[in-house]
Amino acid sequence: MTSPNRFDHVSVEKIANVYYEGRTFSRTVWFEDGRKKMLGIVLPCDADVPAYEFKTDSSERIEILAGECEVKLAGEEEFTYYRAGQAFLVEGHSSYELRNEAIVQYICHLEG
């Protein structure tokens, strides 16, 4: 029986992707059919880092698994609020800013 909180039959990169001196990190998960996703954690922003900025190579659908945050996509004026169970899409060759007051867990579905 498969759990909705677990992936079966996958490979996981041993070394994490680490950004902002360890404040954000993720692990790449490879599926048998070739799909690639990233499971990550974002520690809270503070006075030193009021928002995180990330750049994308390919389209990404980022699903919030736990916590809440605000996201501003490239070209947008305002931040949009997201919480667990919600997702946002970032175009390839673009960027976004994320700010949060508590730990956020996410899965990044690489779309292209």
Where on the chain are the PLM-derived regions?
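Residue-level structural signal for beta-strand termini and adjacent loop
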Residues: 42, 75-77
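Ligand-binding loop in jelly-roll beta-barrel domains
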Residues: 91-112
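Conserved short histidine dyad/triad with adjacent acidic residue
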Residues: 31-57, 82-83, 87-92
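A generic structural motif
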Residues: 30-32, 72-74, 99, 111
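Short, surface-exposed secondary-structure edge patches
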Residues: 61, 78-79
